[in-house]
Structures are given as structure tokens and as C-alpha cells.
Amino acid sequence: MAGHSQFKNIMHRKGRQDAVKSKMFSKLAREITVAAKAGLPDPAMNPRLRLAVQNARAQSMPKDNIERAIKKAQGNDAETYEEIRYEGYAPGGVAVIVEALTDNRNRTASNVRAAFTKAGGALGETGSVSFMFDRVGEIVYPASAGDADKVMEAAIEAGAEDVQSDENGHVIICAFEDIGEVTSALEEALGEAESVKTVWRPQTSTPVDEERAQSILKLIAVLEDDDDVQNVYANFEVDDATMAKLSAA
């Protein structure tokens, strides 16, 4: 029976992974549709759409899905999505920013507020925590793009502000308004990036213990599980040993 049990566990895990991938594709498709509707349906002529398509490809989203999302924006029956930012505090006074694309503002606000309340946090007003973050461009390259020195040199030449390199790859940070220019310059030097996006980068991080970290990670997981939520950012910090323990749980 042990073998049967193991098979069931593997299939359950695969099912969970497939569900996560399906939800991710759905969110990527929504961003593509919104980007295509906001400008031209040609990625070459629409920087936001180009980035959305590039990020979808980096996540192995099928070409048919990408094309369908672009075409959806051109139809008369295309949903109208609104970009909304929610801000609040998780347990321990940790600041959280939630970015959403929604066709029903009331539904999304209700879901986000409920998630904060259940976690022991509180949803605040727009602007209540965003001053603790910087809006920046984040360009990610795989380790195969080159060693740290090569990537650092290319990033400086491109006008980036910061580079973080490790065995997993390279994360390049640039000013929000420079993301298009920096991305193009990096492509010439290093090829196409793995992902390009704008993010909210914490100016400082709040250290939290294992119990608080568990509550915060649970809140983030609940928020990210919502179909309307695109991104979640938080300014907390956990030591490596605690994070490894929580990841293994």
C-alpha cells in the first residue's frame, strides 16, 4: 500500500502544481489583454504589451494562449479591467502592497480586506504604506547570461542602479522611468531577459520571528490565490534558517 500511497501523493502534488500553473497563466493572460487594450495590439509598438508577452514566454505560457489574450483585447465583448492598488499592514506592523486587475472593484476590495482581517492585519488607505517602498524596474537574467562581472559591466553601461548576482541568476534594478531604455541596452549585451517588470522595492525591511513570518506568508499566499491579485509586496525580513524551516513545512 505504501507504493499506492506514494502514487496518490505524487498525483496530488502534480494536480496542485498544475492548478498553480493554470492560475499563473490566467493572471499573465489578463495582463496581456489589459496591455493590448491600453495601446496597440502589436508588442513591437506597445512597450507594456511587449513586457507582458516576454514575461509570459519566460513562464512557458503556450503561444496560442498569448495570441488568444491579445485577440481578446480587440473584441467588443472584452472585459474592462481596472488597475487597483491596496495597501495595509500584516501582523507585526509589516507593510504590504497588493496590485490587482479587476472587473469588479467591490468583490476584490472585499476579498483583500477579508484576507488582511483574518490574518490579524489591517487594510489601510492608498498611500498608507507605499511611501516605504520605491517603484523600480526589475530585470532578471539566468546564471547562463554570464558571470557577475560581465552582468555588472553590462548593467552599468545600460544605466542600471543595482545588480544582485548569485548561483540562481542576476537581478538588475533600474529607475522606474528608465526600464524600457535599460532593458533594450541589456538585450544588446546579454540577450533577452528572463523577466522584466516594475516592482515595489522596500526601502527598509522589518525583521520578524518564525511565528510572525508564518502568519505573513499565509496572508501572502491567500492574497496571491485570488484571481484578481497580480502581485503582492511586503517589507519583512526572515533569517535563512527560519525561511528554510518554513519552506520545508
Swiss-Prot record:
One of its GO terms (biological process) is regulation of DNA-templated transcription. GO terms for molecular function: DNA binding. It is found in: Cytoplasm. GO terms for cellular component: cytosol. It comes from the Bacteria. InterPro entries: Integrase-like_N (IPR017856), TACO1_YebC-like_2nd/3rd_dom (IPR048300), TACO1_YebC_N (IPR049083), Transcrip_reg_TACO1-like (IPR002876), Transcrip_reg_TACO1-like_dom3 (IPR026564), YebC-like (IPR029072). Keywords: Cytoplasm, DNA-binding, Transcription, Transcription regulation. Belongs to the TACO1 family. This is Probable transcriptional regulatory protein Meso_3192. It comes from Chelativorans sp. (strain BNC1).
